[in-house]
Amino acid sequence: MIDLDIPDLDIEDLDPDLEDQTQKNGVEDESGGALTYAVIGSGQGGGKIAKAFYDLGYKKTVAFNTAQSDLALLDLPDEHKFFVDHFGGQGAGKNQERGKEAYEAKSQEIFNKLREIFGENIDRILITVGAAGGTG
């Protein structure tokens, strides 16, 4: 069993500049399933897995990465990609502590992106990672 230390984040009450209805619904899901899933892809491996879900119709998908070059390789609409710019585009260099530092520094922006894409009406969130590098 993997012991994950997921901290509680103090997220300030900032709303992204969105229309109320868009904020409530987020991106329209096209999967046709009984439940509405949202997918988070972290790092290069997680981003590729998230992209596969996007291609299956799970449009409430966001790929995060600290390496801009890895995000550029993903065939996702730009609004579904989030560059965690903390190291000048060079990524976390397979160092998980640097990845953690980057995500903590950008936690509010990450939260806003998730809220923009996911909206408020989701049933489950899948988090996909490769776990071999610094961001996943």
Where are these regions (language model features)?
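Tubulin/FtsZ superfamily GTPase core signature
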Residues: 1-136
